[in-house]
């Protein structure tokens, strides 16, 4: 069915892919991105595992209304999360050689 050495090669490829995935997961966990809102007045730094590391708020916003500040912090968090997702997709494409996964399917499985 797999031919001479076909199954062995397939297993080797699967193992190499698994090793690349583990390395990619470690890189993503160490990665940090910064999301911004209000033209950089609010910045949120987040890890590749979506943990917020730091929130920076321009002092001028502390004098404005509370609701505006809350909206800007939420927007910066969402921007950081979007950037994490983009970086994860880029890393995944490096590992899978650009192979597209079906919609909704996330790796590692």
From Swiss-Prot:
Keyword 4Fe-4S part of the UniProt annotation: no
Disulfide-bond pairs as recorded: none
Subcellular locations according to the entry: Cytoplasm, Nucleoid
First-listed, main subcellular location of the protein, grouped into a coarse class: cytoplasm
GO molecular function, one term: DNA binding
InterPro entries cross-referenced by the UniProt entry: YbaB-like_sf (IPR036894), YbaB/EbfC (IPR004401)
GO cellular component, one term: bacterial nucleoid
Keyword tags: Cytoplasm, DNA-binding
Its biological purpose: Binds to DNA and alters its conformation. May be involved in regulation of gene expression, nucleoid organization and DNA protection.
Family as reported in the entry's similarity comment: Belongs to the YbaB/EbfC family.
NCBIfam families referenced in this protein's UniProt entry, alphabetically: DNA_YbaB_EbfC (TIGR00103)
Subunit structure: Homodimer.
UniProt-recorded name of the protein: Nucleoid-associated protein Sama_1311
Organism: Shewanella amazonensis (strain ATCC BAA-1098 / SB2B)
């Amino acid at each position: 069915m797999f031919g001479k050495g076909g199954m062995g090669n397939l297993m080797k490829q699967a193992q190499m892919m698994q090793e690349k995935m583990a390395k990619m997961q470690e890189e993503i966990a160490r990665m940090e991105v910064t999301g911004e809102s209000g033209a950089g007045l609010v910045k949120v730094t987040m890890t590749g595992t979506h943990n917020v590391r730091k929130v920076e708020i321009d002092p001028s916003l502390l004098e404005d209304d509370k609701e505006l500040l809350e909206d800007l912090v939420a927007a910066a968090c969402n921007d950081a999360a979007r950037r994490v997702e983009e970086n994860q997709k880029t890393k995944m494409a490096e590992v899978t050689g650009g192979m597209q996964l079906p919609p909704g399917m996330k790796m590692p499985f």
